[in-house]
């Protein structure tokens, strides 16, 4: 059974929907598909905005990321927001009409990792736009009701879509143990580095140093809260003695320099996707008793993201530098090549 009423008025849901699909490496194609229906415990969301992530661009250009290979047509996009259009059995029909930010994960709630609260590590995870699971560059998607997070009317759909990369920043800052007075080094001033910079400041860091080889990106980092920016080719990164280092670049040199930059008993967090294997300065890690960990997506971060944005502690709207229609998704996937680009967003549905 699917409820399809809003405030007592019938909602006409289309039988078919649009999707912009990656049909082969470097080629997107608009197709028409049957509209999905929410299962028990799920909601149907009318997509309004989808942020373009570096992983989307990587699948578009390369057809794979590590073990995840695109072997059949795939709908990209996992940073999404919209409005609930229908609900499945077991979901309060009063949720229909709610504006939501989508946490694009479908874990198995019975797995040991999910039961431990680490559902992001669930081995049976179905994650949007990770082969073979389709993403959100389409008119409608279904998601577990608990993963469609209500957003305040003051939050734009574009900002709500970017709760996803913001959640990566939150998870990174949590792993780094950032608190009031922390000194933090962040390598990489791309979208993840920028949201992590904002989160670090919101968590109380008094010094946030952002390292990037691109001058324009360093300027962006300053705009979004970095206290200092450095060019790693021209500055001595290793002598910084910070409390925590977060790598959002994936660059081998940045990781090695960053590890050297951490004071004894400090923390190293690896977020950026780089080489599968890199040489590590093991004596530095051992002798300083550094804690080195990774971040894989996020868990239980959406309420924090909503609170930070609603309070004005994090600015997501200003990160959007380019907007495209669903039909222009292919252009959106290469927008990161535009000088000054921070984040491209695909507007699937206009208005509210």
Feature-to-residue mapping (PLM):
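Short N-terminal strand-loop motif that marks the start
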Residues: 1-79, 349-352
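Mid-domain Rossmann-like dinucleotide-binding core that forms the NAD(H)/NADP(H) cofactor-binding site
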Residues: 155-234
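NAD(P)H dinucleotide-binding glycine-rich loop of Rossmann-like/cofactor-binding domains
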Residues: 106-187
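Glycine-rich beta-strand-centered segment in the early N-terminal region that forms part
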Residues: 36-50, 65-112, 152-154
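C-terminal hydrophobic helical "lid"/dimerization subdomain
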Residues: 2-19, 256, 299, 303-352
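Glycine-rich cofactor phosphate-binding loops and adjacent beta1-alpha1 units
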Residues: 219-291
């Amino acid at each position: 059974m699917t409820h399809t009423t809003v405030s007592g008025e019938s909602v006409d849901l289309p039988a078919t929907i649009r999707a912009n699909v990656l049909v082969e490496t470097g080629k997107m194609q608009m197709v028409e598909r049957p509209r999905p229906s929410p299962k028990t415990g799920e909601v149907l969301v009318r997509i309004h905005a989808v942020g373009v992530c570096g992983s989307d661009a990587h699948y578009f250009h390369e057809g794979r990321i590590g073990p995840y290979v695109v072997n059949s047509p795939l709908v990209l996009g996992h940073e999404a927001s919209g409005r609930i259009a229908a609900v499945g059995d077991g979901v309060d029909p009063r949720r229909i009409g709610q504006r939501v930010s989508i946490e694009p994960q479908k874990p198995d709630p019975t797995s040991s990792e999910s039961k431990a609260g680490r559902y992001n590590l669930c081995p049976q995870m179905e994650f949007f736009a990770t082969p073979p699971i389709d993403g959100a560059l389409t008119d409608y998607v279904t998601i577990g009701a608990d993963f469609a997070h209500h957003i305040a009317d003051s939050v734009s759909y574009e900002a709500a879509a970017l709760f996803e990369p913001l959640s990566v920043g939150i998870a990174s800052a949590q792993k780094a143990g950032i608190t009031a007075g922390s000194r933090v080094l962040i390598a990489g001033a791309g979208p993840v580095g920028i949201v992590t910079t904002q989160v670090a400041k919101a968590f109380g860091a008094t010094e946030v140093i952002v390292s990037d080889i691109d001058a324009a990106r360093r300027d962006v980092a300053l705009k979004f809260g970095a206290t200092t920016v450095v060019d790693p080719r021209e500055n001595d990164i290793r002598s910084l003695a910070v409390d925590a280092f977060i790598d959002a670049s994936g660059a081998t040199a940045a990781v090695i320099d960053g590890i050297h930059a951490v004071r004894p008993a400090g923390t190293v967090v690896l977020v950026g996707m780089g080489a599968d294997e890199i040489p590590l300065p093991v004596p530095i890690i051992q002798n300083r008793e550094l804690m080195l960990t990774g971040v894989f997506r996020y868990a239980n971060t959406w309420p924090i993201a909503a609170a930070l944005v609603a309070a004005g502690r994090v600015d997501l709207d200003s990160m959007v530098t380019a907007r495209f229609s669903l039909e222009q998704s292919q252009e959106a996937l290469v927008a990161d090549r535009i000088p000054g680009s921070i984040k491209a967003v695909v507007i699937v549905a206009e208005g509210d």
